[in-house]
Amino acid sequence: MTTPESSATSSVKIYFRLLSYVRPYVGIFLLSILGFVIFASTQPMLAGILKYFVDGLSNPEAVLFPNVPYLRELQLLQAVPLLIVLIAAWQGLGSFLGNYFLAKVSLGLVHDLRVELFNKLLVLPNRYFDTTNSGHLISRITFNVTMVTGAATDAIKVVIREGLTVVFLFIYLLMMNWKLTLVMLAILPLIAVMVSSASKKFRKQSKKIQVAMGDVTHVASETIQGYRVVRSFGGEAYEQNRFAEASDSNTRKQLRMTKTGAIYTPMLQLVIYSAMAVLMFLVLFLRGDATAGDLVAYITAAGLLPKPIRQLSEVSSTIQKGVAGAESIFEQLDVEEEVDTGTIELDRVSGHLEVKNLSFFYPQTERQVLNDISFSAAPGQMIALVGRSGSGKSTLANLIPRFYGHEMGNILLDGVEINDYRLRNLRKHIAQVNQNVTLFNDSIANNIAYGDLAGAPRADIEAAAADAYAKEFIDQLPQGFDTQVGENGVLLSGGQRQRLAIARALLKNAPLLILDEATSALDTESERHIQAALDHVMKGRTTLVIAHRLSTIEKADMILVMDAGKIVERGTHTELLAQNGYYARLHAMGLDEPAPAGAV
């Protein structure tokens, strides 16, 4: 159970960690602080100038600097207007320095946090994405970062500028009359208690707001990505209600936080102005030998205190929002990255793949997905995995490039355990094409030559497209290989998108090829062309094929029949048909059998 003390300690640690991101901008930050010091120093100056103004009304002949050469003749009525202009200019300089340079720090902080969060996404393990809502991930980069920078910069602006204003005003008041000023100081403990109470509520409510905002982003993202399904199945009303509920929940939580601030701020003002009322009574009652100017200056300085004190109390809301946002950001930044303890790096492997006694449980579950899997594939061999959905085929394919780590059994590539390879080097030797194709909102050429392939000669890109039978439709497009494909290739057909993914794999020219339902989105004619291309490409490469279609696997050197995470049969297409077993039954059904209940 989290105690108030541990929660407060946690908040302080989070806030100081957040402030560490300001370190690269420390020079600019110090300039902004200098600006706020200048700004704050003008507040007691304004109160002091009123003293001379009032005294000048009663004694027009009085001079401001009787002991200063060249200024001893300067009368109050002449000096006061000039000083007011100078004070205003001094205040303007401070305001510019403080606001401009703090804005530079704030924008730099937003950029740094967003880039670090995004870069972290690229090295997080697969299991993190399996269990984390994508809308919340996006919300952290967009919404949470904005709140965090408010705490790291805007809040500091208020704390420094208004805090220094309060300090300078209190110093001035103490110099004027220290006894009366102690009356004002007596209310500080009460203010501290009220601010502390409000801070706890603000942080709790801020966490709820962030979750609600993540839900809004998630629903919107899902609906936009699946708009065709939404329209095809008449899901508009359902999605409208789902989004309205998420947005309404966010609105209610925002209002609850606003309500908290709306209650605490007037209460705080009441306490401050009550103290002011007592102070004014004492000033008038105990005026002694003070001049009218002294009284006006003292009351003016005291009257300038409520505004900065109120702003200091309200900054708690900004800080707690930022701390709550920073907590979720640091949770993501602290997630352990993909394990990469390997040391071996090879320029090229032959593609000899061997799996020994491999078993696998998905993280955070007790269900065994793979059970004692063993097989080997020589370079140039094609191994086909068949079985009903949920039998473990795709899981096995995902273990080879180490999208998930295995602990039971071995996977060897050219006789080396894949965990001993450097992760980037291992994946360099593997090309993978999945049923769900990912294309980026870029040109066709850049989608084929993606990542490490960027910069490949145009001739190689076109050759890969030709081998994947994609060039024929690309040449018909207005801009050819420079045509923009839209978000995730929305401007292309399913078969066209699949052929671009295959072209990307062909351009990579990796010795190990994994085809996970790679031809499932193609029509019969396109599949025939692709199959011919794959027959050529697979020469000299180890190919692991996962398919539900007969034409894809009939030429395999070995077919592994999987069920419930085990290999139940193995052999060539002809051998397995002759056994008249599980494969023969799948073959009779077209190799596409539904998964049992609860299959993953």
UniProtKB/Swiss-Prot annotation:
SUPFAM superfamilies: ABC transporter transmembrane region, P-loop containing nucleoside triphosphate hydrolases. GO terms for molecular function: ABC-type oligopeptide transporter activity; ATP binding; ATP hydrolysis activity; ATPase-coupled lipid transmembrane transporter activity. InterPro entries: AAA+_ATPase, ABC1_TM_dom, ABC1_TM_sf, ABC_transporter-like_ATP-bd, ABC_transporter-like_CS, ABC_transpr_lipidA, P-loop_NTPase, Type_1_exporter. It is found in: Cell inner membrane. The chain crosses the membrane at residues 26-46, 82-102, 167-187, 266-286. Keywords: ATP-binding, Cell inner membrane, Cell membrane, Lipid transport, Membrane, Nucleotide-binding, Translocase, Transmembrane, Transmembrane helix, Transport. It is a multi-pass membrane protein. Its main location: membrane. It comes from the Bacteria. Gene3D superfamilies: ABC transporter type 1, transmembrane domain (1.20.1560.10), P-loop containing nucleotide triphosphate hydrolases (3.40.50.300). Its EC number is 7.5.2.6. Residues 30-321 form the ABC transmembrane type-1 domain. It is an enzyme of class 7 (translocase). ATP binds at residues 387-394. The keyword Transmembrane helix applies. One of its GO terms (cellular component) is plasma membrane. Residues 353-589 form the ABC transporter domain. Pfam families: ABC_membrane, ABC_tran. It catalyses: ATP + H2O + lipid A-core oligosaccharideSide 1 = ADP + phosphate + lipid A-core oligosaccharideSide 2. In MsbA the ATP-binding domain (NBD) and the transmembrane domain (TMD) are fused. Belongs to the ABC transporter superfamily. Lipid exporter (TC 3.A.1.106) family. Homodimer. Involved in lipopolysaccharide (LPS) biosynthesis. Translocates lipid A-core from the inner to the outer leaflet of the inner membrane. Transmembrane domains (TMD) form a pore in the inner membrane and the ATP-binding domain (NBD) is responsible for energy generation. This is ATP-dependent lipid A-core flippase. It comes from Pseudomonas syringae pv. tomato (strain ATCC BAA-871 / DC3000). The gene is msbA.
